Regions:
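N-terminal acidic, glycine/proline-rich low-complexity segments
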Residues: 1-225
Length: 225
């Protein structure tokens, strides 16, 4: 790994511009991440939020998961009194990459492809992904030149000593994962989910999304204040 890439992966100083790519409706960790990011104005300037696709018991398809996440992002922005960022929230991919060379066009992918072009290797845009990395891979396929202008920090995969690679965010879109697709051309750091609470079964340890308890136990709703 070159010294240039290593230097870009070191903890930055001061305030950085960042975007968040998140399957917000899936589980509550994404809502905590977005809320924390919005409150960390001394370190992070949130430029955009992208809805990522997901498919499990909380959605009927990857597209449904993405659309539910998009609505959840807007709900959280309202609860956080950050309605000013709603125009910077974008729908993401409605399906996963069909292969490693074909992007899935979406408002999120187009925004990242255009937004990152305004940055430089010396002043990169930080791309934080905490879901399937379809949107980011698609943006890099749409505009490969942005690879040198972004630093990707992705919550996905397992640590190298883990006995398998059956991790939720990676398995959702294997073709888009770092090491397989265009994300490998960017400065990228993976935060293994095995170090962040993923069970050996490959899916995240389930926590109901913010605002309500498990439907099996109660229909009572809780509203953040």
């Amino acid at each position: 790994m070159s010294d240039t890439i290593l230097s870009r992966l070191r903890a930055p100083q001061g305030v950085v511009d960042a975007v968040l790519d998140t399957d917000t409706f899936n589980e509550i960790d994404d809502q905590f991440a977005l809320s924390y990011m919005l409150r960390s104005t001394e370190r992070i300037n949130t430029r955009a939020i992208y809805a990522a696709p997901f498919f499990n018991e909380n959605s009927s398809s990857p597209e449904d998961g993405m659309l539910k996440s998009y609505e959840e992002i807007k709900t959280l922005l309202k609860l956080a009194n950050r309605e000013d960022l709603i125009p910077c929230a974008f729908e993401g991919s409605r399906r996963y990459l069909p292969d490693e060379k074909t992007p899935v066009d979406s408002p999120a992918a187009r925004d990242l492809a255009a937004r990152a072009a305004e940055y430089s290797p010396e002043h990169p845009l930080y791309v934080v992904g905490i879901g399937a990395i379809t949107n980011v891979a698609s943006a890099l396929l749409l505009n490969p030149a942005i690879a040198e202008n972004i630093v990707v920090v992705w919550l996905g995969g397992h640590s190298l000593e883990w006995p398998d690679t059956n991790e939720f965010n990676m398995m959702q879109d294997v073709a888009a994962a770092p090491g397989r697709a265009s994300v490998s051309n960017a400065s990228a750091e993976s935060a293994p989910s095995s170090a962040a609470g993923t069970s050996r079964s490959g899916r995240k340890n389930h926590v109901p999304r913010a605002g309500r308890q498990s439907r099996k136990k109660s229909n009572r709703k809780f509203t953040a204040r």
